[in-house]
Amino acid sequence: MSVPMTGRSPAAGDPFYARLVGCWRLVRWDSIGEDGSVEHPMGDPPEGLLAYTPDGTMVTNIGRAGRPAITAGDLLEGPADERNAAFGTFIAYAARVALEGQTVIHDVVMSLYPNWVGSRQRRHAVLSDGDRTLVLTADPFPMRGRMSTQRLTWEKVG
């Protein structure tokens, strides 16, 4: 499935989506296992930004704080182990947005993780604190060898 990045998405103009529009800073990422255990995949605290645009586009970048530089100093080259570590501590993707009630659907058009391109990433959204806090919860999926539910808490910054 190829989702174009031009034109307005189905979410554009929706009153709930209008409350999401802006830039958000990641303050917490909980990965909750089926046994109730909680891990923090990108450390505690993680680093991340999420932006929703008025036309229904989203983009996010999430990483572990304090990631080491790749010694080669070259954007596309470097030792394989360092590149693997960099890949394993960063997530980035862009999508068109659709809504089903307060479930936000990211129709992924590009991603650092190529398996997500063309996928629909569903996030159950809850706004609180006068729309200054956003909690996005994903349906369970496998990560680091276990089924887990991802719950990301964001703070509005712009």
Tell me what each language-model feature is.
Residues 1-94, 99-158:
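Lipid interaction determinants
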